[in-house]
Structure formats: structure tokens, C-alpha cells
């Protein structure tokens, strides 16, 4: 097949390829509108006509006042009739789908809000606040839990055996403590605490008896002076000195006589 490399053949081939086929998909807005010169209400940013008799108008180029404003030129009603209400189509449709997904078949309004609240309460039940009560400050202390440890009530048999063991040994080993606890049907901790308290009591009793003994001895000694007292020896020595001063010794009298004779 001979090929032609002339300019005319190449131009005609390119023009034939540029023609759109008959089965091409329709444009984005396949609505017939008047020619561009008849649209006086469109903004300057409106899209230009790509084909004869068709106009692709971008929704962003047409303002809301031009679509929903007062009637103006005769071309504006034609434009509104040609295009669907894209504002409601693109804005309210997703919201409608959301409401239908949440509560299908329920109308909007106070009834819908009440139905939604009832549905929420059934899905997430809340406890009744009347079930809970608060304890006032003035209430008795018996209602509050006590933080003190419960005292162990020992029987007379247990106390007798514990006292007997304490008299023989004040300090127990762990094995002996376990034996006593098993024999008296007590826990090891109870036996340990009892012996600790008993040792403290024993020390207090010993200190009290020592104080009483020391006080009684001091009170008894105040009646009569003990033997070897310094005050008694001093008093006897003073009495002997007084007795010696009363008679005159012969040695002293002779000395005085000699002194009298010597003097002229």
C-alpha cells in the first residue's frame, strides 16, 4: 500500500483523529443551555463552551446569589431549569445518608431526639442514683469501717497454758511457738503477740515493785538513826569537851603559880 508523505495528507489524517467518536461518554454536565452570549448573569470565571450548543459551567464559578437570588434576565430561569439544585445535592445528601444509617425510618425533630435518647439508654444502661447513699458527717461512727485490729479473746484454758509456759520460758523459739499454737488451737502470730505483751507487762510490774521497796526503806529509816552515824559521834565528842572544861587540871594550876612567883 503506497504511503503519501504530503502535507495535505498528514493534516487531513490529524483532523480525522481529533474528531470524537460517536460512542464517547457524555460530558460531566450533559445539559443543553443557551449560547454564552445569552447568559448575562454568569460571572467572568464561567467555563467557555467546548462544543456547539453545550456549556460546561463549574459550580464554583456560579455564586449562590445568582442561582437563588431575585428573578433577573430571562436567561437566569433557563439556567436554573437546566441545572439541578447542586447545593442540596452535594451538601444535604451525605447528611441524609448519615441520619438514615443511624436511625433509619425515624423523622427529624423532637420525636427523633427522644427516640435517640431512649435508644442510647437501652444500649448503655446507667445505674439508678437512688441506689447509692452518702454517709453524712454527723452519722454515728458505727457505720464507718473500723481500722483497728480485732482483739483475740483467749479462753481460760489457753490463758492458763500460756502463763505456765511464760513462767518457764519468757522467750520462745519458733518450733516451740508452733507447738503451742497447734496445741491451743491458735495461730503462730497470736502466740507471738501474746508473749510480747506479757513481757512488757512483766517489765512494768518489776519496775513498780522496785520503786515501792525503795520508798518504804527510806520512810522506816527516819525514826531512829542507824549505827555509826556521824551526828551521834559528834554530839558525844562535844559533850566530853564540855565536861573537861569544868575541872581545872593540876598542871595548869602549877604553871599559873610559877608565873605568879616570878613576877615582882
Swiss-Prot record:
Location of region: SNAG domain: 1-20
SMART domains with a match to the protein in the record: HOX
Listed under GO biological process in this entry are:
adenohypophysis development; brain development; central nervous system development; hypothalamus development; neuron differentiation; neuron fate commitment; positive regulation of transcription by RNA polymerase II; spinal cord association neuron differentiation
Record-linked CDD domains: homeodomain (cd00086)
**Localization in the cell:** Nucleus
Please provide the record's keywords in A-Z order. Answer: Activator, Developmental protein, DNA-binding, Homeobox, Nucleus, Transcription, Transcription regulation
Residue ranges of the TM segments: none
Stored PROSITE patterns = HOMEOBOX_1, HOMEOBOX_2
Q: Which SUPFAM superfamilies match?
A: Homeodomain-like
InterPro entries this protein is in? GSH1/2, HD, HD_metazoa, Homeobox_CS, Homeodomain-like_sf
Q: Which GO terms describe its molecular function?
A: DNA-binding transcription activator activity, RNA polymerase II-specific; DNA-binding transcription factor activity, RNA polymerase II-specific; RNA polymerase II cis-regulatory region sequence-specific DNA binding; sequence-specific DNA binding; sequence-specific double-stranded DNA binding
Give residue spans, biased composition: Gly residues.
211-225
Segments of skewed composition (Low complexity): 229-238
Pfam families this protein is in?
Homeodomain
- Region (Disordered) residue ranges read 201-264
Q: Which GO terms describe its cellular component?
A: chromatin; nucleus
DNA-binding region, residue intervals: 147-206
Which superkingdom is the protein from?
Eukaryota
Q: Where is the composition biased (Basic and acidic residues)?
A: 254-264
User: What family does this belong to?
Assistant: Belongs to the Antp homeobox family.
Q: Which PANTHER family match?
A: GS HOMEOBOX 1, GS HOMEOBOX 2
Role description:
Probable transcription factor that binds to the DNA sequence 5'-GC[TA][AC]ATTA[GA]-3'. Activates the transcription of the GHRH gene. Plays an important role in pituitary development.
Q: What is this protein called?
A: GS homeobox 1
